[in-house]
């Protein structure tokens, strides 16, 4: 999610705006060894129903969750932050990456740190909807059919390589994500709460993959891109592996920061973070701009605006504030929109990247002063 070296190349007359990246320290005016994830400087309090104690609790929970996850999982801080923002926003995430970058380990570590049950489904071409949500099985003793829950009945679900299965299979998962329940033979079965899905997909160019329909992609709050680790992170991975400590032992060292009920409580509290009218207008302008912006053939739905606002609330709370600002919206633009827009044929012929086009779009929107 890095900002292009020359983003104005796509929009020569664009006005400067805030950076569209979680962790690009240079664009935040920070030194490389500083972090833009949490604001250290005191900020004035604005009208909000979220009190100071709750705000401080959010920031503390974020720090502790990251510390626990890092006991087993190295690097990928954008993945960690984006996932936590989506989780406490009540959304789900789609993660695109090549195999071998530790996505399963991350999901397991997240489940441990949250005190939630973890489940995993490996999507394959022959996987059926009943393999995911469950099925009715005949009980010989009672001479009745009983429901046998599928692996989806957990709290933190890793849906691995979702684009390797046909549409009807991942459609069953996406329906459950939307409704919070699974329907089998006309009977509705509620899923545990909280229910959070981390779906992964290989790059679409990979062999044996199916392109997810736009309507299904829209159900994911964020699309996060997990890139290869930096040289320092890769060295740390090798050093940790050389200590001959089993992954199970590292996971066992993770202590729950929250209980499942507290996850639900904080998710509800995030709604109380104040959003100024000017910020609502800013989000609407960004989303509407995708529908007629050069090099975009298909724009984002209103669901994108809902995701931006709710994500900004949570990011502000993680940063220790009870009100959101444009600096909480801008970093979420790429993960919120990159899977909700389609490049025009001309842009594809020119080899444009969707992130570059969206960054230019963001720079063309005037940033409000609150």
Model-derived features: where do they sit?
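C-terminal engagement/docking regions of AAA+ P-loop ATPases
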Residues: 23-32, 36-49, 56, 290-370
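Conserved alpha-helical scaffold flanking the Walker A/P-loop in AAA+ ATPase domains
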Residues: 82-85, 138-159, 187
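Conserved catalytic/switch belt of AAA+ P-loop NTPases
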Residues: 86, 168-190, 196-198, 202
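AAA+/SF3 P-loop NTPase mechanochemical coupling elements
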Residues: 146-155, 184-201, 212-221, 225, ...
């Amino acid at each position: 999610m890095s900002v292009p070296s020359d983003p104005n190349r796509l929009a020569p007359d664009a006005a400067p705006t805030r950076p569209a990246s979680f962790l690009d320290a240079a664009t935040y005016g920070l030194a490389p060894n500083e972090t833009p994830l949490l604001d250290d400087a005191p900020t004035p309090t604005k009208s909000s129903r979220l009190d100071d104690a709750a705000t401080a609790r959010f920031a503390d929970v974020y720090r502790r969750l990251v510390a626990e996850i890092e006991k087993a999982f190295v690097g990928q801080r954008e993945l960690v932050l984006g996932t936590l923002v989506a989780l406490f926003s009540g959304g789900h995430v789609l993660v695109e990456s090549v195999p071998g970058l530790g996505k399963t380990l991350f999901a397991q570590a997240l489940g441990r740190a949250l005190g939630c049950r973890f489940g995993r489904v490996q999507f394959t071409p022959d996987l059926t909807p009943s393999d995911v949500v469950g099925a009715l099985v005949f009980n010989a003793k009672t001479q009745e059919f009983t429901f046998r829950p599928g692996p989806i009945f957990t709290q933190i679900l890793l849906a691995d390589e979702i684009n390797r299965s046909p549409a009807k299979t991942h459609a069953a998962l996406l329906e459950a994500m939307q409704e919070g329940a699974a329907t089998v033979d006309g009977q509705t079965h509620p899923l545990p709460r909280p229910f959070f899905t981390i779906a992964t997909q290989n790059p679409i160019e990979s062999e044996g993959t199916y392109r997810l329909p736009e309507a299904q992609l829209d159900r994911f709050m964020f699309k996060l891109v997990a890139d290869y680790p930096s040289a320092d992170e890769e060295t740390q991975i090798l050093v940790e592996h050389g200590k001959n400590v089993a992954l199970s032992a590292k996971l066992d060292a993770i202590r729950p920061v929250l209980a499942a009920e507290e996850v639900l409580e904080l998710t509800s509290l995030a709604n109380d973070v104040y959003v100024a009218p000017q910020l609502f207008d800013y989000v609407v302008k960004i989303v509407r701009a995708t529908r007629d912006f050069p090099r975009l053939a298909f724009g984002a739905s209103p669901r994108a605006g809902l995701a931006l606002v709710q994500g900004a609330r949570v990011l502000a709370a993680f940063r220790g504030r009870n009100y959101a600002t444009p600096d909480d919206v801008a970093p979420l633009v790429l993960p919120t929109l990159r899977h909700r827009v389609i490049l025009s044929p001309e842009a594809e012929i020119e080899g444009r990247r969707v992130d570059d086009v969206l960054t230019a779009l963001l720079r063309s929107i005037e940033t409000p002063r609150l």
